[in-house]
Regions:
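Conserved amphipathic alpha-helical segments that form helical-bundle/coiled-coil interaction surfaces
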Residues: 65-142, 155-164, 176-188
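A ubiquitous short alpha-helical element
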Residues: 52-59, 73-78, 96-100, 142-150, ...
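Short alpha-helical linear motifs
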Residues: 40, 111-114, 149-157, 196-204
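Residue-level recognition of short, well-ordered coil/turn positions
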Residues: 24, 100, 170-171
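Short linear motifs at protein or domain termini
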Residues: 1-68, 74, 195-199, 203-211
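C-terminal effector-binding regulatory domain of bacterial HTH transcription factors
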Residues: 172-211
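Well-ordered alpha/beta subsegment
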Residues: 165-173
Length: 211
């Protein structure tokens, strides 16, 4: 294929990886790559598409999470409904109840952050936070088993502090608690032997329209 298209093999692999993310093709080990029957899924996973094509570093992902989620936590302290606050409490309780099950813990973690985004009362913030957090957690599932009981307990405590600040309607404290949580989480991720986000950057040549 690379010879036929006149591009390098890494470029072909990057293109196929992007098409697989879109749902256009699927790969079978030992058999090859095939066109799928279903429709493309770019609309539902735009960040996954970009990651497959260009790659995101861990630092970039956490920068975006801080921009979105720290602000969302502050808005949530002002705007969260009683139902939102109740859901946050349930997810924190769920984290403490699943300290021995990293994958179940992660599910509560995902729902907690989703609820913070929804609690912001801004659908744009909620949607962007959902996309970024959702993509991050896709990778996080692969390394969740590396977390110890102590790691999970500290994470649960961090989420509880965020929840308590939102419940108290203290926007500054909510922002500070979320920022500290993300800072600590990033430091933990950087210490892991298998990073959750490790997509190699690939430059895809763009044809010159004049040629």
């Amino acid at each position: 294929m690379s010879a036929h298209l006149g591009v390098s093999r890494p470029t072909v692999r990057a293109g196929l990886r992007a098409l697989a993310t879109l749902g256009v093709v699927r790969s079978r080990r030992g058999s090859g790559t095939f066109i799928t029957d279903g429709p493309p899924v770019l609309g539902s996973e735009p960040l996954s598409f970009l990651a497959a094509l260009h790659g995101f570093t861990r630092g970039e992902m956490y920068e975006v999470r801080r921009i979105l989620e720290v602000g969302a936590a502050g808005l949530a302290a002002d705007r969260a409904s009683p139902d939102h606050i109740s859901t946050l409490a349930d997810e924190v309780a769920g984290m403490f109840a699943t300290l021995d099950d990293p994958n179940a813990f992660l599910s509560h973690d995902i729902r907690f952050h989703r609820t913070v985004g929804l609690s912001s009362g801004n659908p744009i913030v909620a949607s962007l936070a959902e996309m970024v957090s959702g993509m991050y957690h896709e990778h996080r599932r692969a390394t969740a088993v590396n977390a110890s009981d102590r790691d999970l307990r500290e994470a649960a405590e961090a989420h509880r502090r965020i929840y308590q600040a939102i419940r108290a309607r203290d926007a500054q404290q909510a922002r500070d608690a979320m920022n500290e949580h993300l800072r600590t989480a990033q430091a933990f991720q950087e210490a892991e032997p298998d990073p959750p986000i490790a997509v190699t950057r690939v430059t895809v040549p763009i044809p010159n329209p004049r040629t």
